[in-house]
Amino acid sequence: MGGGAEMKVRYNKLWKLLIDKGMKKSQLREAVGASKSTFAKLGKNENVTLPVLLNICEYLECDFGDIMEAVPENEV
C-alpha cells in the first residue's frame, strides 16, 4: 500500500457531541441497545461493529464523521 502511518479510529467527536446534547454515555448505550463492553471499546478507541455505529448515528441524527475520525496511530 502507500507505506504511510497506519490509521486508527478516534471517537472524541462522539463524546463531545454527547456533552453538547447534555447526554450521558449510559443513556446513549441504553438507547441504542449496545453492551457495556462495546462502549468500553469506544472509550478506548477500539474497533466496534458497523451496526453499532449506524445505530448511534441514527439515534443522534448525525453521520459517521460527526462521531469519529481516522487519525495516524501515533495520535490515538
Name the predicted role of every residue range:
Residues V52-D66:
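DNA major-groove recognition helix of helix-turn-helix/homeodomain DNA-binding modules
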Residues L18, R29, G43, C57:
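The alpha-helix within a helix-turn-helix
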Residues M1-S26:
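A short, Lys/Arg-rich alpha-helix, primarily the initiator
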